[in-house]
Amino acid sequence: MSLAKAKEIVSGNPVAVFSKTYCPFCVSVKDLLSKLGATFKAVELDSEKDGSEIQAALAEWTGQRTVPNVFIGRKHIGGCDATTALHREGKLLPLLTEAGAIAKTSTA
């Protein structure tokens, strides 16, 4: 059930961040996405009644037990380090745009 819920969240949003409210790495990722103007769904696992089950299901699905657990365009990206590395490499913005999390701007 929890895995199905996680997959539904991932498939229903251009960007999904499984997070915990007290996690500084989660805050960093959400701040970065916000600064880039990305639309994302944050699921605060410590506020969800089935949060620990969702986290366990995510670990089984992705092999990652920690938060944040970031998905862009239905693809597992990883955590804070992976997300910020993509940004440093100039690859995050194109991924977000391709996923539909950032509106494409017209140059006309």
UniProtKB/Swiss-Prot annotation:
One example of a Gene Ontology biological process annotation: cellular response to oxidative stress
CDD domains on file: GRX_GRXh_1_2_like (cd03419)
Keyword annotations from UniProtKB, A to Z: Cytoplasm, Disulfide bond, Electron transport, Redox-active center, Transport
GO MF term set: glutathione disulfide oxidoreductase activity
One GO cellular component, as annotated: cytoplasm
Localization: Cytoplasm
Pfam families the UniProt entry points to: Glutaredoxin
Residue ranges of domain Glutaredoxin in the record: 3-103
Main location as per UniProt: cytoplasm
UniProt record similarity statement: Belongs to the glutaredoxin family. CPYC subfamily.
Protein name (record): Glutaredoxin
